[in-house]
């Protein structure tokens, strides 16, 4: 079975655990679910949904791959070669200035695989499934959930 989760991101962390669990219960079998992001700057991550832990992750990302601003306060990522649009070939007209987002994606996965027992996700007590938005929010994103029977 394959299901698509469509979301419009409004923050860095979007908890998708309940939606994946709902699909898993509907499926009702044992096996695995692969949760896959179709996007290069939107990742899938399993971790604890604790506010200070998420603040630590945000702080780490801002240190490792900051999003630069010019003196007028506008975002200007000229620190990243990816953002030198004039030097790149085949760049779409709506290309984002998001070199920092691509560097941040190095720390996450594009997918996670979770075991299922009779329709129930097998997650640890505190473990949640997140979509991680590495670009500025307000993006339409698709997550593919593929259920594989035992």
Located regions from the model:
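Active-site histidine-anchored catalytic micro-motif
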Residues: 1-150
């Amino acid at each position: 079975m394959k299901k698509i989760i469509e979301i419009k991101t409004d923050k860095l962390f979007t908890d998708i655990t309940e939606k994946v669990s709902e699909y898993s219960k509907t499926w009702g079998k044992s096996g695995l679910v692969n949760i896959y992001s179709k996007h290069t700057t939107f990742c899938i991550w399993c971790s604890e949904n604790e506010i200070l832990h998420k603040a630590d992750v945000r702080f780490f990302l801002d240190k490792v791959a900051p999003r630069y601003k010019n003196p007028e306060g506008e975002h200007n990522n000229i620190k990243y070669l990816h953002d030198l649009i004039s030097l790149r070939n085949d760049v779409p007209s709506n290309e984002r200035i998001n070199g920092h987002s691509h560097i941040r994606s190095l720390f996450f996965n594009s997918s996670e695989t979770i075991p299922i027992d009779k329709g129930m996700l097998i997650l640890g007590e505190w473990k949640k499934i997140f979509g991680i938005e590495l670009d500025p929010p307000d993006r339409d994103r698709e997550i593919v959930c593929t259920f594989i029977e035992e």
